[in-house]
């Protein structure tokens, strides 16, 4: 999850490279924030570089050999090292009984359901900051409603919101319907000025 400082005409970029392969580069362009997904290969060593006007709010690896049991693997944006979750959560400032996200803002739980051997919890999330903002849906799973495993984010704000700091919106409240072919999500899409009014659309 990358954000770009709001500087007129300044593009931001992230580059991921590994020996023997062409580097992968993503430009934020006019976007102030963006969820970036890049494919990597097991056993390879990667180097990440970014422009000075880009900040990484959080990073994780997903789609491992057993993603539901293992969940995502969080990385330190500063050096790419693995984050040991036991030490990360074992602090006086962290709720120890209820689910809390890895970092930053969380509010309303949504789409609580049971599917394929797991309880699924979706929740509104701002992965970039410790304050309310354009909403994503985070995702976590559990077998006992006590021990939760973080999964990749499943919904993000509309792309037109990524470049406009004077609008708000994204994936607001909703629910889930379990059917034979999977989980179907229903939600409110919100788009409007910072203060709700006649131009707010849902």
How should each PLM-predicted stretch be described?
Residues 1-202:
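Carbohydrate-active catalytic/glycan-binding domains of CAZyme proteins
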